Amino acid sequence: MFRSALLIATLVSAASVNSANAERQIATLSASEAEAIIDGCQAFAETNDRIHGIAVYDSSAHLLAFLRMDGASVGAAAFALEKAKAVAMWRFATSGMEEAVQGTPGFGNAPGVVSVAGGVPVFSADGKDFLGAVATSGEPPLQDVECAEAGITAAGLSATRG
């Protein structure tokens, strides 16, 4: 009898949790927004005679869009993927991870940490919702950041929490 009551209580509890989760919407990038970020970043790079690998992940750290520009090395493209995934996982810029590694013993060994600038979080236009991440690689880190931010701006989104 006790086991039956416990099983029923567990099932009811699980059903109410699932119902609450179904009602909660998680903000994330759409495929069209990811493409707009890639297009904006590529346009910025071409205007400034730069070559990048560009990666965009959603808020759950799933790859949405990727481009290895003509002439970009395989290594640069792979590094863009790693930077963007790190930002999607940790929800802050890789430049911040660089600072955290220097100031927080052991943080550099945490899963997914990339301590080189170039990965940038993507927020909704009003800065309220974390939507995902974009990263570029192939140029000096600050130029990678500029390109990523240009892509975010071109998509009508924000690189900063507001």
Identify the function of each model-found stretch.
Residues 12-20:
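C-terminal segment of classical bacterial N-terminal signal peptides
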